[in-house]
Amino acid sequence: MSKTLFDKVWDSHVVRKIEDGPDVFFIDRHFIHEVTSPVAFLGLKSRGVNVLYPERTFATADHNTPTINQHLPVQDPLSANQLQALEDNANEYGISHWGLGHQKNGIVHVVGPENGITLPGATIVCGDSHTSTHGAFGAIAFGIGTSEVEMVLSTQCIMQPKPKKMRINVNGKLSKGVGPKDVALYIIAQLTTSGGTGYFVEYAGDVFENMTMEGRMTVCNLSIEMGARGGMIAPDQTTFDFLEGRLYAPKGEAWTKAVEYWKTLKTDADAVFDAELNIKAEDIEPMITYGTNPGMGIGITKHIPSAKEVEGGEETYKKSLAYMGFNEDDVMIGKQIDYVFLGSCTNGRIEDFRAFAEIVKGRKKAENVTAWLVPGSHVVEAQIKEEGILDILTEAGFVLRQPGCSACLAMNDDKVPAGKYAVSTSNRNFEGRQGPGSRTLLASPIMAAAAAVTGKLTDPRELF
């Protein structure tokens, strides 16, 4: 029987099928952080239960960590307590822990791949929505709640109904200035934030085949924003080249055998999907969001649609525009902005900083812009320095901060003030997401760079 990539990975991890119920599903890799894990560990302790496979769980501090002066004690009491709890729990149960200052520390969905923990054909969970990032490697990866974190810690399994399957094909050649973030935002704009509900998505077509692993991670990261359970891309030579030699990746003969198996992880020619979407790469231009969900995105040269042109309630749509201070039929180009955020598990990798630096090189940060440039990990931070990118950023008037989730969800001090506009390379533009009253415009690193040096929304293609 022909199978999709998703079927092959899912079916190989089902421990038991429950009639008219969810599957008992084995988890290969489990990532935890300081926010969603403390209560799960309290549950274990209250039941007198141990962590079944501590070597399959990895802990990193990221969500509410400061991005300056990380060598000093964390000032916020709640954050300090959560960070200490993560360290204590990891030590007690024998779990690898990369806290503040550790050379491997960083955002969970950045450090997993860069250390070779994320592998093709694996099942991966974390108490975080954007766990779908790891699907870029041909893994099944999705976010879970705190009670499920406890379940995985104690049993290494989870109860999960099998989602339906959707394939999104993007073929053709992307225009200059259009990158993975634009592709993802375009897809979400087409499907809406609920169009993927109930599905696990496979991204296919030559656009994804030609993407780097960093680009694929950006796309899979945003799968959850169309309502999907997750997204994945079949592993290929690009995947293998990225993983070879990384710390937790197989070595020697084990590597050879692993690659041999990974090459089988692709959808069979006559496999059937429950839904399919076809997109022409040439239709995608640099994207920008204008509302309060990631599906409210348009090409930078387009006008904001009228309420009658979009799905959903007219009252809700107008409320969203009012929150953003925009009107129907507004042109986005030329709108002044106040903040720029480069970072997050969506766009905090070395490729994103290279793209940003390419635009700002030889230019200066606009005086009206406050910029937060936050690498996704210490490894990325080191690469920025080694490649001379830091020199370019410094010359242009930018300051590099220390790794963490930062302004993506503003759990630390990196908060956008009320009423201010932030061009952000993160993944969510909900009301107050980056601080109470903040106004978020989701964009690619290139778009963010263009805004940072001009002080307003600018078509980045004009700066090449």
From Swiss-Prot:
Pfam families found in the cross-reference section: Aconitase
Catalyzed reactions: (2R,3S)-3-isopropylmalate = (2S)-2-isopropylmalate
Cofactor: [4Fe-4S] cluster
GO BP, sorted A to Z: L-leucine biosynthetic process
Biological or metabolic pathway of the protein: Amino-acid biosynthesis; L-leucine biosynthesis; L-leucine from 3-methyl-2-oxobutanoate: step 2/4
EC number: 4.2.1.33
Amino acids binding [4Fe-4S] cluster: 345, 405, 408
PROSITE patterns in alphabetical order: ACONITASE_2
Keywords, comma-separated and alphabetical: 4Fe-4S, Amino-acid biosynthesis, Branched-chain amino acid biosynthesis, Iron, Iron-sulfur, Leucine biosynthesis, Lyase, Metal-binding
GO molecular function annotations of the record: 3-isopropylmalate dehydratase activity; 4 iron, 4 sulfur cluster binding; metal ion binding
Cofactor: binding comment: Binds 1 [4Fe-4S] cluster per subunit.
Role summary: Catalyzes the isomerization between 2-isopropylmalate and 3-isopropylmalate, via the formation of 2-isopropylmaleate.
Family: Belongs to the aconitase/IPM isomerase family. LeuC type 1 subfamily.
Quaternary organization: Heterodimer of LeuC and LeuD.
Name of this chain's protein: 3-isopropylmalate dehydratase large subunit
Lineage: Bacteria, Pseudomonadati, Bacteroidota, Flavobacteriia, Flavobacteriales
Underlying gene: leuC
